Regions:
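Secondary-structure junction motif
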Residues: 188-207
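Short helix-loop hinge/linker segments at domain boundaries
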Residues: 53-56, 63, 74-97
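Central regulatory/effector-binding core of bacterial HTH transcription factors
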Residues: 92-154, 301
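Short helix-boundary/capping micro-motifs
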Residues: 12-27
Length: 301
């Protein structure tokens, strides 16, 4: 039995929370994962996992062995990176993720500058408006908007964004400018499918929040489509401010209901751990964080 491989498999199961998720993460057949865990338990003469149909839970022995395995594998990885020179020169593939518009408009310019600066690093960018899992999707650094759900990740804040309401000048001239959220019932709106925002929009009212009904004249599935429709004069739409910053500066979209803006949402770079980071990852975070912060601060200007 390859004990380092067995430790790697057990850690994948523990981190992913199930054998099937570990199988997807490692790209190894489900039966192989189960067999290697069973072999390790036989070798140790101890039960490491409590299995159920969907999830697994570490036993007391499993918790202790996983903690020790994590330290051992980290030390082995450090030794390999030191021997290969990775701690002297950042190199290798770096996998990044971000929401589509935020990634295209703000992360991509940083990445192109980073690639010019570090020719030994290759980057793979995964842009998606659904939340990707850093562990399961093999992501080194993610750019995230909103409250962080996984407390085991390390986060570096690079700014805040807000949800705003906007429309094209032609629409506002034709239909008038809403003064309060109650006015929305008299307007056409562009909303997103499969979300509550297609029926109501939430605004702060005093110290609480209140839902206001909206009329969805057009329902779309992407932010880009909503922006184009708003510019074309179809109606009001509600977006995160970074999604319309270019159009707002160009004058093709105007903000309304600015006195009723929602609370700011934090934007973070997230990654696994802060100690023993591969040099390529630490180098990117140090390079990207101040540049992203400056770019995001410029959204409202």
């Amino acid at each position: 039995m390859d004990r380092l491989e067995a430790m790697t498999v057990l850690l994948a199961v523990a981190d992913a929370g199930s054998i099937s998720a570990a199988s997807r993460k490692l790209r190894v057949p489900l039966a192989t994962i189960s067999r290697k865990v069973s072999e390790l338990e036989t070798h140790l003469k101890a039960r490491l996992l409590m299995r159920s149909n969907r999830r697994v839970k570490l036993t007391e022995a499993g918790l202790a062995f996983v903690a020790a395995s994590r330290r051992i594998l980290q030390d082995v990885g450090d030794a390999e990176r030191a021997a290969s020179g990775e701690y002297k020169v950042p190199k290798g593939e770096l996998v990044l993720s971000a929401p589509i518009a935020l990634g295209r408009l703000y992360l991509l310019p940083v990445v192109t500058d980073f690639l010019r600066e570090y020719p030994s690093i290759d980057v793979r960018m995964m842009l998606a408006d659904r939340r990707l899992n850093l562990v399961e999707d093999h992501i080194d650094v993610g750019l995230r908007v909103g409250k962080l759900e996984d407390s085991s990740l390390t986060a570096k804040k690079v700014g805040t964004v807000r949800r705003v309401v906007c429309a094209g000048p032609e629409y506002l001239e034709r239909r008038g400018v809403p003064k309060t959220p109650e006015d929305l019932k008299n307007h056409d709106c562009i909303t997103f499918e499969n979300t509550l925002s297609s029926q109501t929009w939430t605004f702060p009212v005093g110290k609480t929040e209140k839902d206001f009904p909206v009329h969805s004249r057009l329902v779309v599935s992407t932010a880009e489509a909503a922006v184009e429709a708003a510019i074309a004069g179809i109606g009001l739409t509600r977006m995160l401010d970074y999604q319309i910053a270019v159009q707002r500066r160009a004058g093709t979209l105007k903000l309304v209901l600015e006195s009723f803006r929602s609370p700011p949402k934090p934007v973070h770079l997230i990654f696994e751990g802060s100690r023993h980071l591969p040099l390529k990852t630490r180098t990117f975070i140090d390079f990207a964080a101040p540049r992203l912060k400056k770019a995001i601060e410029g959204i409202t200007k």
